[in-house]
């Protein structure tokens, strides 16, 4: 069958099945998938712009702006105006946000390890490398 060897379908199906398993844990922790992606992408970095976050969480910038404002009201993130470009805002994770996302980061790493366990380390790294190349090529 065509779809059984069609790359976009295979990628979408793999993403759907792998992500759904972990997204249940995200929702059990009280976050939406987009909130999880925002917190995870801010963990370990000083700050990101709303535009960068929109690219990472695969959402439109106005949607991410609304999420960031709501998350800031819950003290999960902090929004700071950009001094170079008044249209932009910097977003950073708060200590509360970091504390809440830390257990999920550990669960995500364990989930990834379990998903990739049948491949072994060389194939796992090769798969990630190939996916990163495809992503860069398409952008």
PLM regions and their residue ranges:
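Charged, amphipathic alpha-helical coiled-coil/dimerization segments
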Residues: 19, 69-132
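Short alpha-helical "packing" element that flanks the helix-turn-helix/winged-helix DNA-binding module
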Residues: 38-39
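Short capping segments at the starts of secondary-structure elements
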Residues: 45-49
């Amino acid at each position: 069958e065509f779809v059984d060897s069609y790359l976009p379908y295979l990628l979408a199906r793999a993403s759907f099945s792998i992500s759904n398993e972990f997204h249940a844990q995200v929702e059990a922790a009280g976050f939406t998938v987009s909130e999880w992606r925002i917190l995870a992408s801010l963990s370990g970095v000083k700050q990101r712009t709303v535009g960068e976050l929109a690219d990472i969480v695969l959402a439109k910038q106005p949607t991410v702006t609304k999420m960031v404002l709501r998350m800031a009201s819950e003290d999960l993130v902090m929004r700071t105006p950009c001094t170079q470009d008044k249209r932009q805002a910097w977003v950073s994770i708060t200590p509360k946000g970091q504390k809440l996302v830390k257990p999920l980061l550990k669960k995500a790493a364990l989930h990834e390890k379990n998903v990739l366990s049948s491949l072994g380390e060389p194939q796992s790294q090769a798969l990630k490398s190939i996916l990163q190349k495809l992503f860069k090529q398409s952008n």
